[in-house]
Amino acid sequence: MASADHTRDPCPYVILNDFGAAFSMGTIGGAIWHSIKGWRNSPPGEKRISAIAAAKTRAPVLGGNFGVWGGLFSTFDCAVKGVRRKEDPWNAIIAGFFTGGALAVRGGWRATRNGAIGCACILAVFEGLGIALGRMNAEYNRPVAPVIPDAPASGSTSAAPAAV
């Protein structure tokens, strides 16, 4: 049985921290993405202005979407940890299932089911890759015993062979 992770803050702080981190990642990534998109889809002579305008209008929206996903996922992750009283990869997969379903619930039963299963599968792949990379990294960083040179043969102390 895995023990609780005491290196992180309590859940309310973790939820707010994850929401902010996801919002920041979405906003920065959205600014880069939408500025490139605005640059490419503008007439000559207005490329810089269009890139800035596209980034200013669309990046906060993408940041908000990322933030909602991160906050919901972190909330469900803390709830699952509290219910299961375990710290293992299944928590993230279950939280991903709930997050995908909650975000798609406005689309009806089929969208909720597909969103929940899809998000759980994505989180399962992420968790599996994390475990595989962790094992691979642990194998490379395994302690190795130092090489001890062989002891000289007994009875022969000189380096030169005896004369016959």
Swiss-Prot record:
The keyword Mitochondrion applies. GO terms for molecular function: ATP hydrolysis activity; protein-transporting ATPase activity. GO terms for cellular component: mitochondrion; TIM23 mitochondrial import inner membrane translocase complex. Pfam families: Tim17 (PF02466). It is a multi-pass membrane protein. It comes from the Eukaryota. Keywords: Disulfide bond, Membrane, Mitochondrion, Mitochondrion inner membrane, Protein transport, Translocation, Transmembrane, Transmembrane helix, Transport. Belongs to the Tim17/Tim22/Tim23 family. Component of the TIM23 complex, at least composed of tim23, tim17, tim50 and tim50. The complex interacts with the tim44 component of the PAM complex. This is Mitochondrial import inner membrane translocase subunit tim17. The gene is tim17.
